[in-house]
Amino acid sequence: MKKTILSLATFAAIGFAGSAQAAKVDICVFDLLGKSGESYQMAQEWALAAKGWGAEINLIPRQDEAVADNDFKAGKCDGVFMTAMRARQYNKFAGSIDALGGAPSNAIAQRAITFALDQRNAAKMVSNLGGKKYEVAGIAPLGSAFIFVKDKKIDSIEKAAGKKFAVLGYDEAQKIMVQRVGAQAVVSDVSNFVAKFNNGQVDMVGAPAYAYKPLEIYKGLGTNGAMFNFPVLQVTADFIIRPDQFPAGFGQKSRDWFVKHLPKSIAMINRLEAGIPAKYKLNLSAEDKTKYQKLLREGRMDMTKRGIYDAGMMSVLKKARCSVDKANFECSLSGE
């Protein structure tokens, strides 16, 4: 009897030890600058914290976003950090924070991301595609995207007609919106869209301040270029995982970590935006700003009807916008 009890106790102890071992997982991290980039460095901080949630993280840097996504699809990674525009295929709710004009300031983006990652939205963070389960385990802001032009004479959207505009090929919203203003959409990838601007293949490009120095946008601007000082959309990165490869409750702990680090990320973005030389910044009149807001609103509502954006997230973003700017024309309108 004593031997039996001893055997059971030993078995239980072994079982407990096995369950206490950290789950070893591979995470692909897209960063154009590889290990030296800000996104990869943030992932390193996150990986250290993840040890406390029962996961042993192996980070795999990827400088090509398509490769990171394909590696995730092929099962070479258990999770992937990539831009929300590409991650939208896994979760439309989280991926729609990047909607055109959806979060026109970093403060609004912070509110929207905080709400999305809150525990009350945990169910919306999980999706099932093709019999496979995915979960959004984090959202990180990369900052507002601004339009850069090679010639400052292109000082209005009307003057963009006929001009070549680099767009990310996998984001239908960009292509549709560029065509709506009469410009020519030049299909590109995140690895070459700024290069096309710098070498003169396109006249216009949209990018966050985050990309200004690393991608050398100043080369494309030269002495005659400009930046519309008007945020077109908020660029974010999503962290997508296969939850069955991680300890129970991991996703929410990870999301809480991202929320905690939002102020630090927003402060960094504000510094980067302030760092763009004033000589390039083209300030718009209040009248033009309202006109462009209306244009983006119409485009956003159209994209939602087409199924590109998530209607629930559009409602979240509108509430965030109107909580910051209650006097905005759209706050008294229905439709989102």
What are these regions (language model features)?
Residues 27-111:
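Extracytoplasmic small-molecule ligand-binding "clamshell" domains
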